[in-house]
């Protein structure tokens, strides 16, 4: 179980340890714009994110809206595209729709439906959840999150939104799943050749869910092929989604099917209503033939399958909250617009802080960027929480805090000024420039070196 717990002393100890590591690492950190191998978009730092309630009611409401393209419908980067349907030869566009229960089960399988790191309590804010392979947040969005995509090699506003804000993360994950569905028949097989591949039929999402984690098979480092010998004989016990079974014994889509039918409980209430779904029956000769590993050959045209039976026709969720209710109306505000930092003769630098406030409602995302390589910022992006949301028990609540210090080895002179640009993708208003004046008690020698002033 990956639920958060509030452990004040432990969190303070972790924070102190992290601060020590931060101070020790400052001089070694590569600034944005410097190539880094195997890094994520915000490396070496981690943005802050908001973690909502333990019951995940805000997240499941956002998923309901995303499933019918009512979460961020006017933003092409986050909106659902038309969902194709039809056989391999007759695909046509249809209404944007994904079964909400499927998205909820994927969110649980990916992250236990959490946006922030495990140590962050519910109803709070803190470091975002980022996996070893750059999966971000609730939907573990990896696509577009492995390198900075903004100007001058800095992270983009979209990347900040995905990393910090649950709604944008959910919307992007839903769009990626829709793109996997629409990849049939060119890149993945078609499920539901006998039901016009109707996306309202839950079982027809089998290949798209497989592809969400990676359309991989035998020979891959992680295979999701149901007939891969590593998973044993069929039928196998259903995945229970309760932490008692090894996930490595199942292909990804069977993990999702198991969680969809057996949601976790919190406070005696399931996170979402249980929704059974039928897997392809590999004891059925036609189904086993289609899903034989001998057919694992691009373009997978021999892997098309009929809808597994019994099939489940899914209706859109009832009582969907509006985008305005889920997103609120954030208002971007900040404190100081000029700060002064000092660096003593030993190279130790003072720190400055800038508070980012949300004068409205909902979750405000902010991002800080600079092209001045001697400025070190932490976190590089974060959140500020509006008056309508509960946010307690953390240093990052309700305001965001940007901490600024100096890498003295990169100072261009003993007296220097740099600029940090603060902006909000969803808070309106203009970007705000923070001027940082630096005074060092040593003179600068060759580039990248310094010496104490006598």
List the predicted regions and their residue ranges.
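A short beta-strand micro-motif common to beta-rich folds, especially ectodomain repeats
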Residues: 352-354, 402-406, 412-426
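Beta-sheet-dominated interaction scaffolds and their linkers
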Residues: 321-359, 442-454
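Short, solvent-exposed loop/turn and secondary-structure capping segments
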Residues: 116-129, 221-225
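Surface-exposed binding patches on compact interaction domains or structured appendages
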Residues: 328-338, 359-403
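Secretory targeting and sorting signals
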Residues: 4-35
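Short, functionally critical alpha-helical segments immediately adjacent to catalytic or ligand/cofactor-binding
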Residues: 79-88, 94-122, 141, 208-213
């Amino acid at each position: 179980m990956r639920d958060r717990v509030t452990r004040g002393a432990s969190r303070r100890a972790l924070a102190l340890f992290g601060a020590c590591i931060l101070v020790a690492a400052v001089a070694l950190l590569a600034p944005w714009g410097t190539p880094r191998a195997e890094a994520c978009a915000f490396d070496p730092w981690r943005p802050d994110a908001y973690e909502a309630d333990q019951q995940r009611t805000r997240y499941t409401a956002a998923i309901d809206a995303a499933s019918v393209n009512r979460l961020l419908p006017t933003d092409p980067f986050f909106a659902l595209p038309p969902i194709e349907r039809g056989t391999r030869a007759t695909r046509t566009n249809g209404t944007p729709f994904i079964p909400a229960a499927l998205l909820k089960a994927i969110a649980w399988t990916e992250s236990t439906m959490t946006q922030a790191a495990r140590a962050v309590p519910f109803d709070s804010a803190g470091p975002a959840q980022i996996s070893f392979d750059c999966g971000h947040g609730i939907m573990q969005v990896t696509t577009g999150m492995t390198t900075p995509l903004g100007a001058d090699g800095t992270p983009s506003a979209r990347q900040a939104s995905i990393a910090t804000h649950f709604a944008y993360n959910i919307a992007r994950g839903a769009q990626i799943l829709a793109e996997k569905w629409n990849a049939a028949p060119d890149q993945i097989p078609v499920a539901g050749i006998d039901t016009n591949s109707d996306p309202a039929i839950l079982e027809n999402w089998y290949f798209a869910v497989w592809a969400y984690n990676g359309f991989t098979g035998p020979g891959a480092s992680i295979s999701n092929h149901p007939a891969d010998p590593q998973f044993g004989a069929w039928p196998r016990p259903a995945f229970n989604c309760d932490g008692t079974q090894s996930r490595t014994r199942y292909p990804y889509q069977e993990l999702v099917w198991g969680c969809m039918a057996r949601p976790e409980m919190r406070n005696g209430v399931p996170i979402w209503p249980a929704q059974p779904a039928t897997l392809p029956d590999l004891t059925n000769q036609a189904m086993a033939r289609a899903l034989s590993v001998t057919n694992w050959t691009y373009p997978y045209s021999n892997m098309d399958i009929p809808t597994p039976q019994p099939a489940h026709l899914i209706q859109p969720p009832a009582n969907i909250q509006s985008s305005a209710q889920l997103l609120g109306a954030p208002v971007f505000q900040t404190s100081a617009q000029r700060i002064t930092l000092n660096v003593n003769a030993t190279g130790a630098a003072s720190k400055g802080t800038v508070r980012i406030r949300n004068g409205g409602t909902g979750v405000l995302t902010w991002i800080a960027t600079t092209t001045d390589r001697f400025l070190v910022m932490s976190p590089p992006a974060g959140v500020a929480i509006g008056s309508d949301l509960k946010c307690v028990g953390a240093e990052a609540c309700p305001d965001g805090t940007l901490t600024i210090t100096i890498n003295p080895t990169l100072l261009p002179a003993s007296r220097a000024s740099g600029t940090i640009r603060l902006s909000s993708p969803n808070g309106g208003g203009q970007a705000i420039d923070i001027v940082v004046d630096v005074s060092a008690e040593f003179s600068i020698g060759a580039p990248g070196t310094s010496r104490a002033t006598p």
